[in-house]
Each structure stands twice: as C-alpha cells, then as structure tokens.
Design a protein with these regions (language model features):
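A conserved catalytic-core segment of Leloir-type glycosyltransferases
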Residues: 1-51, 92
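Membrane-proximal helix-turn-helix segments that form the acceptor-binding/catalytic region
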Residues: 38, 42, 71, 84, ...
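Short N-terminal targeting/anchoring amphipathic segment
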Residues: 42-61, 74-79
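Short beta-strand scaffold positions
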Residues: 54, 145-147
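A short helix->loop->beta-strand "cap" motif at the edges of active sites that frequently abuts
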Residues: 72-76, 141, 162-163
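Carbohydrate-associated surface elements
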Residues: 150, 171
Length: 179
C-alpha cells in the first residue's frame, strides 16, 4: 500500500531469506535496527510527538525506536504482548515446559536452542537480547503496559522496575461471554 507516510516506514526486508546477504540484512535489523533509524528520526522531527506508543516492534522495527524517541525527549509507552523482553524466544517455554532460565541469564536460549529449536536462530535471539537489554530498555521507556498482573510480576522477576510496569487488562464486555 502506497501512502504519504511511506517515507517514514522502515526498509522492507525478508526474515526468511535463503541467501547470505538476506540473512545478514535480517540479522542486522534484529540486533542493531539497521534500516530503521533514518526514517524514524525523520518521523520524530517532522511530526514532533509528545508520546510514542510501541507495540510488537521487535524484528520489523526494533527497540532502536525507543532509544531515538528517548534521545529527543519524547515519552515512550510500550504495550507488551509477549515475554520477549525477559525471554528471547518470546514465550517462557522450552520444549513445551515452563522456563524462566533466561530471566537472569540469556545464554540459556542458546544452550537449550529455544528459538525454533535452532542453534543459529537461538544465537540471533541471544544477540538481540544482549543488545536490547533491560537496562537500556528501562532507561528509554517511561512505562510498560502489561495486560495482566501475572505478566507484570514476571517482568519484575526478569529485572524490570515495578515503577515502570502498569497493568491494563484486556477485556470484553460481560454480556459477550456465554457460560
């Protein structure tokens, strides 16, 4: 879809590329945010927002957008939809079992091949977690919105400050639930 806002979009890349150049490009986006910075800076400069609200930014965008907003003095609110910030493979599951090993040491994603049961994918997930770590993300983000108290508690367990975690539950109207 072509629209006026295209000039702000991140460069499109394939995360399922088979060739070496494509794989390097995808890894560079995931670990360093390559292909995002210039256009997002332009967006911040031209739009001058008071707040940036982030959702599902890993891979296609990158946590670099939180850093860029922070550097310009723009407040950053980040709604969480998974456990990516404390578990490099997103789910707190390892081979079907609950796992919290990465809360304190991200190397477990590699040792257990948690990402797609693949050593290379797990190394990439580890690199991403090491670069976009809780110290940086907590500094750049004013508030993380958690859809449940459980998630907020897990985020705290993973080292995120309670003062930055807000619980706003997802819900539907009671009249929409059939018992």
């Amino acid at each position: 879809i072509v629209c006026e806002e295209n000039k702000y979009f991140a460069e499109e890349i394939s995360f399922s590329a088979k060739d070496l150049q494509g794989k390097i490009k995808a890894a560079s986006r995931i670990i360093w945010g390559i292909g995002v910075v210039q256009n997002f800076k332009k967006l911040l400069e031209e739009f001058q927002p008071d707040v940036v609200h982030l959702n599902n930014i890993h891979s296609y965008l990158s946590p670099i957008v939180a850093k860029l907003a922070y550097q310009r003095g723009v407040k950053v609110i980040w709604t969480l939809h998974d456990y990516k910030l404390i578990c490099p493979s997103y789910s707190c599951l390892c081979k079907g079992n609950t796992c919290e090993a990465c809360f304190t040491d991200k190397k477990h994603v590699v040792l257990r091949k948690c990402m797609k049961n693949s050593f290379p994918a797990s190394i990439l997930a580890w690199g991403e977690a090491m670069n976009w770590n809780k110290n940086k993300l907590s500094l750049w983000t004013n508030s993380f919105i958690c859809p449940s108290q459980f998630m907020a508690e897990k985020m705290q367990q993973g080292g995120y400050p309670a003062s930055k975690l807000q619980v706003i539950s997802n819900f539907i109207g009671e009249e929409q639930v059939q018992y």
